[in-house]
Amino acid sequence: MGLSGISPLSLLLILAIIVALFGTSKLKTIGSDLGEAIKNFRKAMNSEETNDTQKDDHKPL
């Protein structure tokens, strides 16, 4: 058994259907866009944490 009761053969069949529907070039574009979105999200989260710690440093005790 694979993930959540899905067999590896079923996963390969689903992957083949997705490739047939979208084509490899479209999947590559989607993958690149998704990776860039995740990278930008992480960058925004890290900069927000940095800004929060800088604001906390200047609070009076």
UniProtKB/Swiss-Prot annotation:
Swiss-Prot/TrEMBL GO biological process terms: protein transport by the Tat complex
Entry annotated with the keyword DNA repair: no
Compartments in which it is found: Cell inner membrane
Transport as UniProt keyword: yes
Annotated GO CC locations: TAT protein transport complex
Task performed by this protein: Part of the twin-arginine translocation (Tat) system that transports large folded proteins containing a characteristic twin-arginine motif in their signal peptide across membranes. TatA could form the protein-conducting channel of the Tat system.
Protein family (similarity comment): Belongs to the TatA/E family.
Protein name listed in UniProt: Sec-independent protein translocase protein TatA
Species annotation: Legionella pneumophila (strain Corby)
